[in-house]
Regions:
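Active-site-proximal loop/turn and secondary-structure-junction residues that shape catalytic pockets
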Residues: 130, 163, 193-195
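Residues that form or immediately flank small-molecule/cofactor binding pockets and catalytic motifs
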Residues: 12, 81, 110, 192-194
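N-terminal auxiliary segments of SAM/dcSAM-dependent transferases
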Residues: 1-16
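Short strand-turn-strand beta-turns centered on an Asx-Gly dipeptide
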Residues: 20-21
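Class I S-adenosyl-L-methionine
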Residues: 171, 175-195
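Local beta-strand/beta-hairpin segments that build beta-sheet-rich folds
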Residues: 1, 24-25
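The AdoMet/dcAdoMet-binding core of the Class I SAM-like
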Residues: 25-159, 166-173, 181
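Short, intrinsically disordered, charge-balanced linker/junction segments flanking boundaries
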Residues: 1, 120, 191-195
């Protein structure tokens, strides 16, 4: 519907998924990413109950969150329903994180979804792909401002981006950080290397 989705298999990484020719995740190393975007904010925030995941249609982030008993609700806004269907078919060990009764999937534009939310979430995880194509609007000042309004006073936003260690990603990373720092009074960066 919105993007070309392919699933391949390799001896090194097992099955892996691509969107429009770009690798999104593989079954061998997706745990690194999922653990980093979940366990760091959960270690910092004392009482996360209500979570919004933007993207997240593979179920990996919600699967990690569901390990915490205090989680009461997870809203996943994944624009492309076909992405969810493909992940359920080819990555059942990851997509099991979509089957819990606390998880609600909305196939909707994330920016529009956020505009109607105020002071609602303890944690927002932007699990969208890198800032190009259909996800480009999820890396703007308006988007970060909408996230800020949707968070409770002690809420946390976590977002991912390309590696600042690669020249082709460095400028985009800098630009993203400036937008976030402009909106959020307290902003910190942490990194994980994913092969």
């Amino acid at each position: 519907d919105y993007q070309r989705i392919d699933v391949f298999e390799s001896p090194e990484f097992g099955k892996f998924l691509t969107l429009n020719g770009s690798v999104i995740f593989s079954e061998q190393d997706c745990f690194i990413y999922n653990e980093m975007v979940v366990h760091v904010p959960m270690a910092v925030h004392p009482d996360v109950k209500n979570v919004l995941i933007i993207g997240g249609g593979d179920g990996g982030v919600s699967k990690e969150l569901l390990q915490y008993d205090n989680i009461e609700n997870i809203d996943i806004v994944e624009q492309d329903s076909m992405f969810v269907d493909v992940c359920k078919e080819y990555f059942p060990e990851t997509s099991i994180g979509l089957d819990d009764e606390r998880v609600h999937i909305y196939n909707y534009d994330a920016l529009r979804f956020l505009r109607s939310k105020m002071n609602e979430y303890d944690l927002i995880i932007n699990d969208a792909t890198d800032p190009f194509g259909a996800s480009e609007g999820l890396f703007t000042r308006e988007f970060y401002g909408s996230c800020y309004k949707a968070l409770k006073d002690d809420g946390i936003l976590v977002y991912q981006h390309g590696s600042p260690f690669y020249d082709e990603d460095e400028d985009a990373c800098r630009s993203m950080h400036k937008k976030v720092f402009h909106t959020f009074p307290i902003s910190r960066v942490y990194q994980a290397h994913i092969p």
